[in-house]
Amino acid sequence: MPDLRIISPRTPAELEAVRQLCWEYRAYLMSLSAFDAELVTLFYPEAKYAALMEQIAESHAPPHGFIRLAMLGESSVGCGMVHSLSPGSAEIKRVYVTDTTRGIGAGYALMQSLIAECRRLHFERILMDTSKPLVAAQRLYLSLGFRLRGPYQPVPPEAEGHLLYFEMTL
């Protein structure tokens, strides 16, 4: 099996691979349940998500954010990104690995890279959330030292009780 590498996407092709993975992530979330599909459509309607994807490199640009891309050989198999919520606080977003690479450590490697870069950038804590059906992701975050916490941003009533929130002190 080719080596798994975590890179910082820099070329247009690498950034396009991140965008494609984010679209796959959106589709994956929508496939979890009818309720999840409603939430994704509510919070990330297609036009809004397309605009977000067009600005992804800028909205996660250093020194206030960054993107990581998981590569298996020459194939893009996962991504994750960070942006600053406030001085000292980073938020991890859109951690996703493809179906074919789940279980080989790609998610773990992505998270390790994201956490290490947050430390290097002197963030004091990392915040993140995930949907309750994503049990494997929850196990991963807890195994890495994140702890459960309450919401760190206002939660729309439609999403109350459907998300779990995590925090790691660095």
Predicted segments with their positions:
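Short coil/turn segments at alpha/beta junctions that flank glycine-rich nucleotide-binding fingerprints
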Residues: 88, 104, 120-124
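Active-site acidic-Proline motif in GNAT/NAT acetyltransferases
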Residues: 98-100, 104, 132
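Acetyl-CoA-dependent GNAT
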Residues: 9-93, 98-99, 111-113, 117, ...
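Loop/helix-junction capping segments adjacent to catalytic residues or to phosphate/diphosphate-binding pockets
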Residues: 12-15, 104, 135
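C-terminal "cap" of GNAT-fold acetyltransferases
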Residues: 2-5, 10, 124-127, 131-170
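Residues forming the Rossmann-fold NAD(P)(H) cofactor-binding site
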Residues: 104, 108, 112
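Conserved amphipathic alpha-helical interaction elements at protein-protein interfaces in regulatory
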Residues: 103, 116-120, 147
